[in-house]
Regions:
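P-loop NTP-binding/switch modules centered on Walker-like glycine-rich loops
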Residues: 18, 206, 210-214, 218-296
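Conserved ABC transporter NBD signature motif
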Residues: 98-106, 118
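Short catalytic/signature loops enriched in Gly
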Residues: 3-4, 10-16, 30-50, 55, ...
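Conserved ABC ATPase signature
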Residues: 180-184, 188
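A short, proline-enriched helix->beta-strand linker immediately N-terminal to the Walker B motif
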Residues: 199-203
């Protein structure tokens, strides 16, 4: 099978709620200079000259569209840039390059004041339910804070009524509003975080590994709650996770990240059935399967993930790629996302 050259994977569909174009997020750091050989141990280098500037390329040149009403899963190993991308899309982190559009409005360079009316339409559910809630605020104050900031309620009584309604929607009793976060379990705290995210009736929610810190027995409850809320409120999700089974269950489409770049993007069913990128194939081979007839042979990748400070030239995955007899382009030419015969987009020189 051959690629279809006419298709442009970067062409935004008409129903795209969020459009990301060539977005990068790099963090400047300073590295220690290597100590000159032969320098006596008692000789100390000046701090001004003992460190050299460097850049962590957390997210690089990402193109992505999130369609209205869908759940786009974002998967990859820890440290690949998933959470950084989610926060950059919401402008919680400032992009180093590229453009971000929300509902056809370019928000990339908007001032915080101009962006404020859009904030209520874009929310985030954080990974750690223990750290994302202010321990000095009651649950009611934490949920109702956004209502006051965006002037969505006219009185304290209206705010209390709205908070009680939100608590009921996430399966908590109204009297929880008078209690503090430390009085709740992890699963209950995450429900509070979800209620807070829904307070302003958003259209787009970034779910940043919302179940990774929870017990397995609680994870399914939170996923089912998110699905019910999406159906009721017509929400659009970016669901970030490293749990491939959960992502398969909840997602309409799935994007796979490696070292700050999207390497594959496809409908969930197609990606899990016939992954095209060698990295995606290796990821899915590690997913446990109950039925021995559906088990894949485990693909073991050599070495470690390269440093995002100095990513490899060409395809960043080539030092670990299990494909034999790789073409020269893998070592020298950066692969771009291209549409394959089945509609999957893959950034790979050998994928078909």
């Amino acid at each position: 099978m051959t690629a279809r050259p006419a298709a442009d994977p970067r062409a935004a569909p008409a129903d795209a709620l969020v459009s990301v174009r060539e977005v990068s997020k790099h963090f400047p750091i300073k590295l220690a200079w290597p100590r000159p050989p032969g320098l006596p141990p008692h000789v100390r280098l000046w701090r001004a000259v003992s460190r050299m500037p460097a850049t962590v390329q957390a997210v690089t040149a990402v193109d992505l569209e999130i369609r209205r009403g869908e759940t786009l899963g974002l998967v990859g190993e820890s440290g690949c840039g998933k959470s950084t991308l989610g926060r950059t899309i919401l402008r919680l982190l400032e992009p180093s390059a590229g453009t971000i559009a929300f509902d056809a409005i370019d928000v990339t360079r908007m001032s915080q004041r101009a962006l404020r009316p859009l904030r209520r339409r874009m929310q985030m559910i954080f990974q750690d339910p223990y750290a994302s809630l202010n321990p000095r605020m009651t649950v009611g104050a934490a949920i109702g804070e956004a209502l006051v900031i965006h002037r969505l309620v006219a009185s304290a009584a209206e705010r209390a009524e709205r908070v009680a309604e939100l608590l009921a929607r996430v399966g908590l009793r109204p009297d929880a509003a008078r209690r503090y976060p430390h009085e709740f379990s992890g699963g209950q705290r995450q429900r509070i975080g979800i209620a807070r995210a829904l307070a302003c009736r958003p259209e787009f929610v970034v779910c940043d590994e919302p179940i990774s810190a929870l017990d397995v027995s609680i994870q399914a409850q939170i996923v089912n709650l998110l699905e019910d809320l999406q159906d009721a409120d017509h929400l659009t999700y970016l669901f970030i996770s490293h749990d491939l089974k959960i992502v398969q269950h909840i997602s309409d489409r799935v994007a796979v990240m490696y070292l700050g770049r999207i390497v594959e993007l496809a409908e969930a069913r197609a990606l899990y059935r016939t992954p095209k990128h060698p990295y995606t194939q290796a990821l899915l081979s590690a997913v446990p399967r109950i039925d021995p007839k559906t088990r894949r042979e485990r693909i073991l990748l050599p070495g470690d993930v390269p440093s995002p400070i100095e990513p490899p030239k060409g395809c960043a995955f080539h030092p670990r790629c299990p494909v034999k007899d790789k073409p020269a382009a893998c070592f020298h030419e950066l692969p771009r996302l291209r549409v394959l015969q089945n509609g999957t987009q893959a950034a790979c020189h050998v994928a078909e």
